[in-house]
């Protein structure tokens, strides 16, 4: 039987309607977070797409020392808690160390392990021990079949609900490529799989002191991923991505999101009807 992860009234599974995980790359302040959450909630409600709000309190792996990291865990969790209570929506955010897991789990519904940290055993253990859903991004350096080792670690440490995310693989210097086989291979582990459509177009360190990206390919890759038959799409969204503090070149402009989601719903419906 294929694994389905349940979160409140949302069911996350590779054979079910896709779930949207979206929000700005980092938490920029309470007003901005509430603005983005409200817009995304209204849009996904209108389109009948299950929605999980995402934003990060700390971008701990910025390219340069000059990169803006975010508001930090205390202020960030306070804002995410406000978003959750205001809109009654599930929340996902990143954790970067064992010490962050317990406090973060008090607020959010899903703990996300960043791609660069996907093999860090102590971090996986700490996340699993919270009892929360754990979503792991496959490292850009890791083969999809090697995610079975990540799965085994989490299961040994007690994790019951696991999600895996594809976010591209290293393709030479400052470039990533999306191998759609990865989605099918990770699905064979009986884990719901999510495709990160925005980080997959990232050009790591491509601007010297920061990462670049090719936003124009986000929709194309999202359509391809949905056509495989997956559990969710992850997209970072901003009302003014070119002036966002991080990952602007990859993020989708809020005004363009609706048209993309309408197309993805059609692709998702056809794919799962055929299967």
Swiss-Prot record:
Q: What GO terms describe the biological role, i.e. biological process, of this protein?
A: keto-3-deoxy-D-manno-octulosonic acid biosynthetic process
- Tell me the pathway: Carbohydrate biosynthesis; 3-deoxy-D-manno-octulosonate biosynthesis; 3-deoxy-D-manno-octulosonate from D-ribulose 5-phosphate: step 2/3; Bacterial outer membrane biogenesis; lipopolysaccharide biosynthesis
Per UniProt, subcellular location reads as: Cytoplasm
Name the principal localization, coarsely classed.
cytoplasm
Q: Which reaction does it catalyse?
A: D-arabinose 5-phosphate + phosphoenolpyruvate + H2O = 3-deoxy-alpha-D-manno-2-octulosonate-8-phosphate + phosphate
Q: Name one Pfam family in it.
A: DAHP_synth_1
E.C. number, please?
A: 2.5.1.55
Q: What class of enzyme is it?
A: transferase
- Any idea which UniProt keywords this protein has? Cytoplasm, Lipopolysaccharide biosynthesis, Transferase
GO CC annotations on file:
cytoplasm
Q: Which residues form the signal peptide?
A: none
Q: Which GO terms describe its molecular function?
A: 3-deoxy-8-phosphooctulonate synthase activity
Instruction: Tell me which Gene3D superfamilies the record gives.
Output: Aldolase class I
SUPFAM superfamilies for this protein: Aldolase
Enumerate the transmembrane spans.
Answer: none
| PANTHER family named among the record's database cross-references | PHOSPHO-2-DEHYDRO-3-DEOXYHEPTONATE ALDOLASE
Instruction: Output the HAMAP family linked to this UniProt entry.
Output: KDO8P_synth (MF_00056)
Family to which this protein belongs = Belongs to the KdsA family.
Q: What is this protein called?
A: 2-dehydro-3-deoxyphosphooctonate aldolase
Q: Which organism is it from?
A: Rickettsia prowazekii (strain Madrid E)
Q: Which gene encodes it?
A: kdsA
């Amino acid at each position: 039987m294929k694994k389905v992860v349940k979160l409140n009234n949302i069911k996350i599974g590779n054979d079910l309607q896709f779930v949207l995980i979206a929000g700005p790359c980092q938490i920029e302040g309470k007003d901005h977070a509430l603005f983005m959450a409200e817009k995304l909630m209204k849009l996904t409600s209108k389109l009948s797409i299950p929605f999980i709000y995402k934003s990060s309190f700390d971008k701990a792996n910025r390219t340069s020392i000059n990169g803006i990291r975010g508001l930090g865990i205390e202020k960030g969790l306070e804002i995410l808690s406000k978003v959750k209570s205001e809109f009654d929506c599930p929340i996902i955010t990143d954790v970067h160390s064992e010490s962050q897991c317990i406090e973060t789990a008090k607020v959010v519904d899903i703990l996300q392990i960043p791609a660069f940290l996907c093999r860090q055993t102590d971090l996986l253990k700490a996340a699993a021990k919270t009892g929360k859903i754990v979503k792991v991004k496959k490292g850009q350096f890791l083969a999809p079949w090697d995610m079975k080792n990540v799965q085994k670690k989490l299961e040994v440490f007690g994790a019951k609900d696991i999600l895996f995310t594809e976010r591209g693989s290293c393709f030479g210097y400052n470039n990533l490529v999306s191998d759609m086989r990865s989605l099918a291979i990770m699905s064979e582990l009986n884990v719901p799989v999510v495709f990160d459509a925005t980080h997959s177009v990232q050009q790591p360190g491509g601007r010297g002191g920061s990462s670049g990206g090719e936003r124009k390919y986000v929709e194309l890759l999202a359509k391809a991923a949905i056509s495989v038959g997956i559990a969710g799409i992850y997209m970072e969204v901003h009302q003014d991505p070119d002036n966002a503090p991080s990952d602007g070149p990859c993020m989708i402009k809020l005004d363009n999101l609706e048209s993309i989601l309408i197309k993805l719903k059609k692709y998702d419906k056809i794919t799962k009807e055929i299967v």
